[in-house]
């Protein structure tokens, strides 16, 4: 799935070989009715029945329902949750696997914000929990990803053209995050927008706006 802020649309691709982007082809499926005219971040629930989008104009996270799991053409807007009290420039959105924690990356404060959902995957039940400034490492964070265990966090940085890695001594708790290392993508893309990892962490996928290309890396 790729989110395009030029057309304000999310596009779906099919991979004939799992996790191999060289086998990807456009599935002729898209969705654009997520109440955001400058979308920046996209995320799906674990079962593929919900789609979340954030962006600069609404300063909110929208929630859409998919009547057929993982088929983006069956999505319909359900509701949205304003995050304007914390950020006016949200760039990425991520959820814990159980849908009870939501994380948003932000370029207005160069921070990561955490929200707790009293009802899993229901953004209307979200409440602000904590924040983490990443200014020391990155002054223009574009996306966020956490490992399934919640003990590793990765921030996509536009200014540094790197993926920054953090360790969390307490799972999902931003107050326990410490910077570990970074990986530069400047040889492939110098204007980063997003990063995603395979479930087992063995592959990393990065996208940027300079080349409009997705790059696949092996991490093992």
Model-based region annotation:
Residues 46-47, 97-98, 148-149, 199-200:
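Residue-level detector of Asp-centered blade-edge/turn motifs that repeat once per structural unit
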């Amino acid at each position: 799935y790729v989110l395009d802020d030029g057309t304000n649309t999310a596009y779906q691709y099919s991979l004939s070989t799992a996790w191999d982007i060289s086998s990807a082809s456009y599935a002729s499926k898209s969705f654009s009715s997520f109440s955001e005219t400058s979308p920046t971040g996209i995320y799906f629930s674990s079962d593929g029945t919900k789609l979340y989008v954030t962006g600069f104009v609404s300063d909110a996270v929208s929630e859409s329902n998919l009547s057929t799991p993982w088929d983006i053409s069956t999505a319909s807007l359900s509701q949205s949750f304003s995050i304007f009290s914390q950020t006016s420039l949200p760039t990425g959105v991520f959820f814990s696997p159980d849908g009870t924690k939501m994380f948003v990356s932000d370029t207005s404060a160069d921070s990561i914000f955490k929200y707790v959902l009293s009802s899993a995957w229901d953004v209307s039940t979200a409440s602000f929990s904590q924040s983490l400034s990443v200014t020391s490492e990155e002054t223009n964070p574009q996306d966020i990803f956490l490992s399934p265990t919640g003990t590793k966090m990765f921030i996509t940085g536009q200014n540094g053209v790197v993926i920054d890695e953090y360790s969390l001594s307490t799972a999902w708790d931003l107050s326990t995050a410490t910077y570990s290392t970074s990986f530069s993508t400047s040889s492939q893309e110098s204007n980063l927008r997003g990063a995603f990892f395979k479930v087992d962490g063995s592959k990393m996928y990065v996208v940027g706006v300079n080349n409009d290309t997705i790059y696949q890396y092996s991490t093992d």
